[in-house]
Amino acid sequence: MQSGKILFAEQDGNYVLKFVGDVRLTLCSTLDHFLETMLDNQGFKAVIIDLTETDGIDSTSLGLIAKISVKMKQRHQLRPTIVSTNEDISRILLSMGFDKVFFLIQERATPQVPLSELSPMQESEQSVRQRVLDAHRVLMELNDSNRDSFRDLVRSLECD
């Protein structure tokens, strides 16, 4: 598995986020910062999240992706789109309830646009811990199964 990276493009308020390789906790600060900037953009219209080249993705990254849907609904009354052609990734998305808060497309449908890589950010351990905690809280809100799966992790992070 190649190490993960996140690519992006923006045109006229329409964003594409492409997750490549093995996307893990190490990219959570980078992703969360970009998402806040994107969603605060006055010209924001839509986002497509392309997981067609994603080999693996951890629960923190999934929680941050879920946060996109929550924030888009709150701020713009919109529902984002996820494109995934990897059966394993698609199965994870469905099991975690992403089909309830995203449009899921399981065929390659991402516009071919030039993409730039998000520069990795470094943050304190405490900041990363808070992002991990917030991401898992978002996942817990999606369904009862997630609530059961992440309850102990969230409690542990809250106690630290």
Feature names for model-found ranges:
Residues M1-E53, V70-D160:
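STAS-like cytosolic regulatory interaction modules
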